[in-house]
Design a protein with these regions (language model features):
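Helix-coil boundary/capping segments in enzymes
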Residues: 31-89, 107, 121-122, 126-144
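Active-site loop segments of alpha/beta catalytic cores
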Residues: 1-25, 29, 84-367
Length: 367
């Protein structure tokens, strides 16, 4: 019997076309044991760090993640922009939505002044007078791609923003400032947010040119008990922007993968409506998975971990196997719609035994 190519297995799971088994993604360790390999699109500031690695100290947008030595990615402690960049009249060399200007372009009726990216240490972001959009830096950003593609073989090639959209906005403005911007500074918020969205659209075009199969978004909308902002406000401010990005991804031939931490059941149907192909519910322990299945099973492909707050940390291998079966039963179908997700989380207390059990749990599943 011929084994199905791994990229084909993933595609069939996403599109409900009967893969031969449940695909598995190993996220941060042992990636070649899985069906998907991840390529990091984020860069450091020019001259800081290397491509396809998180070894930079200052991100290309200008934010700095302070590491605490516990193995996590770190936390932003200083906003890049203490004041919102001023808005100006339309900039003539920026692109607009229109049939002759390409899909996914963002209108430029009011924009912050834009300066070329330079070393943030000599910048004047605190004045609120300019906003620096990262350069595409395609040659540098794709410098690790040839070796990555060779390593991929027949695996699915997933390009990741690493952190995207809303999360980037909160890093630039600081979380408290960002939350106030949504209500008190709607025009300034829109101007800055659209620059972020526009840059991500350019990265998607680049990823498609280089032969990736999917694009990965990472925004956290949930807390342990509900959303950070109200669903109506999310639908007003963010849903239309995501819809434009997902439509562009599909025009480019890319699947859309969306990661979200926290409890966000109220907007999961919205993500399906606007074109998310793979929804990663990162914390199944705080979401009503049975309710999610009733709403979306058979229509939405899910990428699911064994909870790295509960079962994969404190459970036994038998508990982990049972949880994988439960998630698959509630969300998967014989035609597909389910991808297993394995992440090494010793920083959260995950044992080596339980890490290995997570991979084995998904290997045991059958569509």
């Amino acid at each position: 019997m011929t084994t199905m190519a791994r990229q084909e297995r993933v595609r069939r799971a996403i599109e409900f076309q009967r893969p031969d088994r449940v695909p598995i993604v190993f996220w941060n360790r042992n990636q070649t044991e899985g069906d998907v390999l991840l390529y990091h699109l984020a860069l450091g500031a020019p001259g800081d760090g290397t491509a396809n690695a998180w070894d930079w100290s200052v991100n290309e947008w200008g934010y700095h993640l302070v590491k605490s030595g516990d193995g996590t990615m770190g936390h932003p402690v200083e906003p890049v922009y203490r004041e919102l960049p001023r808005t100006v009249a339309a900039v003539s060399d920026r692109r607009k939505v229109g049939p002759d200007r390409g899909a996914g372009r963002i209108d430029d009726t009011a924009r912050p002044a834009v300066a070329p990216y330079h070393d943030r240490r000599s910048a004047t972001a605190a004045t609120g007078e300019e906003f620096r959009v990262p350069a595409l830096r395609e040659e540098e950003r794709m410098s690790a791609a040839p070796a990555f593609f060779e390593k991929c073989g027949d695996r699915y090639r997933l390009a990741s923003f690493d952190l995207s959209g809303f999360t980037v906005y909160t890093f630039l403005r600081g979380f408290e400032n960002a939350m106030q911007d949504f209500l008190l500074e709607p025009e300034g918020f829109a101007a800055l947010m659209d620059r972020i969205v526009e840059f991500e659209c350019d990265l998607m075009r680049m990823a498609a040119r280089h032969g990736f199969h999917g694009i990965h978004f990472a925004d956290d909308w949930g807390t342990q008990s509900g959303m950070m902002i109200s669903p109506p406000l999310w639908r007003e401010l963010f849903k239309p922007r995501y819809a434009k990005q997902f439509a562009l991804a599909h025009e480019l031939g890319l699947h859309t993968w969306y990661h979200c931490c926290g409890e966000f059941v109220e907007i999961m149907d919205d993500f399906r409506e606007i074109g998310v192909d793979v929804l990663n519910i990162s914390q199944p322990n705080v979401n009503d998975i049975a309710e999610v299945g009733r709403r979306l099973r058979g229509r939405q492909c899910f990428m699911m971990p064994i909870s790295y707050q509960t079962v994969s940390i404190t459970g036994t291998p038998a508990d982990i196997y049972a949880e994988a079966e439960r998630l698959h039963r509630l969300l998967g179908t014989p035609d597909g719609g389910f991808i297993g997700y394995v992440e090494e989380y010793s920083v959260m207390g995950m044992s080596e035994r339980n890490y290995c059990a997570c991979g084995e749990a998904f290997r045991r599943l059958r569509c």
